[in-house]
Amino acid sequence: MNALFVINDRADVAMLLDAAVHLGQDDLPPTAARRIMAQESIIGFSTHNEAQLRAGDQEPVDYLAIGPIFATGSKQNPDPVVGLEELRRLRALTKKPLVAIGGITRATASSVLQAGADMVAVIGDLYPEPCTKSALRARTEEWVSICR
């Protein structure tokens, strides 16, 4: 299984670790991140609506994220839910890879991918209860099989 190591928000840390960086709307602008990171570095950018997606499509980023697709408990003040129909509509606005994020579970991941997302980003449904090594390995294998 291949995985991409992505640093959230901090292009400087990503550069030092030779990792990818994911930037939000209130972080360092993608053009500034691209100036300090290696040209081949992967940069992603969060969007939450059509206007942000259109603007993000003009940025020097390798992928765009859109969400939250569903209600999420991972953010204190989440943006309004995008939903599957809006995801399907927004997919047509960019040729860049589109990562769906927000409230995605094993039960909903397939429908999110079918709606046009190229990838899903998951926080809450990633960790099993209890979070033992064997349970985490089994959960990871479930996610890998869903996303193939």
At which residue positions do the language-model features occur?
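Glycine-rich phosphate-binding active-site loops on the catalytic face of alpha/beta enzymes
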Residues: Q25-A33, A65-P78, A109-I146
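Catalytic cores of alpha/beta
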Residues: F5-A19, H48-D62, L93-A100, I104-V122, ...
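Alpha-helix-loop-beta-strand connector modules within alpha/beta enzyme cores
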Residues: M1-V6, L28-H48, N77-R106, R139-R148
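Glycine/Thr-rich beta-alpha phosphate-binding loop at enzyme active sites
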Residues: L16-D18, L23-Q25, G44-T94, P130-C131, ...
